[in-house]
Amino acid sequence: MHFKEISPIETVNKLKGILKACEIEVDETWLQKSSLNTYTVRIEIKGTGIGTNGKGISKDFALASGYAEFFERFQNNMLGTNVIVSDKVDEHGGALDGKCLTAEELIANNNSFMRLYFENRNMGNASFQDKVQNFKSVHVLEHLLNNEDTYYSLPFYNFKDGKVEFLPINSYVLNYGSNGMCAGNTSEEAIVQGLSEIIERYIQKRLFTEKPALPDIPEEYIKQFPYIYEMFLLLKENSSYKVMLKDCSFGGKYPVAALIIIEKNTGKYGIKLGCHPDYGIAMERAFTEATQGQDIFEYVNRSVIDFFNTNVEDETNICNSYKIGVGQFPYQLFGRTPSFEFAPVKDVSTMTNAEIANSWINEFINDGYDVLVRNVSHFNFPSFHIIIPGMSEMRNTSDTLFRVYNTKHLVSGLLYNADKITLDNTKYIIGTMDYFSNAQLENIVSNFYSYLEDVKIPFEELGEGCPYLTAMCYIVNKDYLNALREITYIENRIIHRKIDVNVLNWITSIKYYLSAMCELKDHQKALQYLESMFDKEYILRLDSLFDDPASVIIKQYPSSAQLENLKDNENYKRFEHAFHQYICAQKKNPINQEDIAKLIEFNSDKVTYD
């Protein structure tokens, strides 16, 4: 049963029933079965493209995975971008059970999250007033939104102290993202899933920072799990690749396994970790995650060996590895002498999810961590967000990062009102696009909008929306040299792809137009020279787009009127309906976070996993 309390089909039927009762329609889209006979399905709110992926060793398990993750994100209000509505509640991320606290109140609470916040700034011993001043100077978004110096904070239950604590949402979301969000058939099953994700990413970060040489998982040990061994042997049949299963348990403490696939003679490889208290399931997850949305051998395109360890410890590199598996891992992982010996993790085959959840929480507390859990099961499907300060951070946020996100909010407002983009404020767009240029899933212009439908962002489909917008901002400033640099960057990235030749010709014509403007500084003269090099259709487009540099963005990006009209589109209404169902569910089924301790039967005096 994979430590599932009910069968996967029962889970799917239950969740489909909840969606039907809420009149939320979803689409199921199956991807091609992988060469390992694993399955991937996409669950989306009908017509919107917004949803989650499911994966598994059978179609039933993949469906259950997809629907469970859908509810995990849905109940945590992390399902796509937030709809812009008039209610002030949207400014608080949609959660109704929070409270507005002053900086003084947050700092006086002195919980583990706030302590870590100031320790990361070398302000652990700073005066109370200095901490207040620092917090206010960095967290200005709330003031911009509400014209108030208060910070909307959500309740979490602290298992160590046995009480509810409030964390400022705009602070902790940047630290933790969706890490530790979980769902399951029971509260205990969900908690085990959430803790497994936290441990997996904690170990993944240790691979970057400690750079251990990993021991092999012995083949005799893998044979204890026949379906894992079968997949392992199937992969090894392909002589073009080398396949390894590595132990990441750090001496048997953490049930984490790594699947490494190397494309021979190229330097390319991929690493995928999996975690679960049952080590067979941990290995299985490494396989199924690596096949999500692709054949498993395509996973080698995630990393290349680099003996300089360039950017290995960079926060963006580590975050990218969490999000989509793309990242530069330290070459030391491939060392022949392991940093620790393989040691089997504890056998949990006779334990229940309740016992595992209880003992894991005890273990974290014994290691000196606080375990903070927020129950969001408003649709009566157990879902939570677990935060372990000092362990579950996706990144350690600096004051600079918070200020960048403040600026991102400003840039979003400018893009919603493109006619207000001027010489004076393009610098904010340029700086923000540059900051996120290497951040996977964040280097997308459409992320600066709420839900978009039938609106095309130039070069977004090719993954080049950010550098293109940056180039247009430089053109507004008549800085043709920097605009040329961005357009040349785009051309170099797309020239070898299988794309419409007209698209490539268009970006090339822009490149030569900009190079002409660098020298000639005259729009008409530049076009005259290019007339002998490009077809008339490209010359006409260049003339129409660039005759007035100040209007190049207005001509290409959606206007505020277009964006407002999107609210009349059927698919926008579907997403808005889902969001309002989430609001209604909170009102109908409010949750007292103090009840979490009863839900998972936590007993601080009883340790069953030693």
Question: Predicted regions: what is each one?
Answer:
Residues 1-610:
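Helix-biased "structured C-terminal domain" signature
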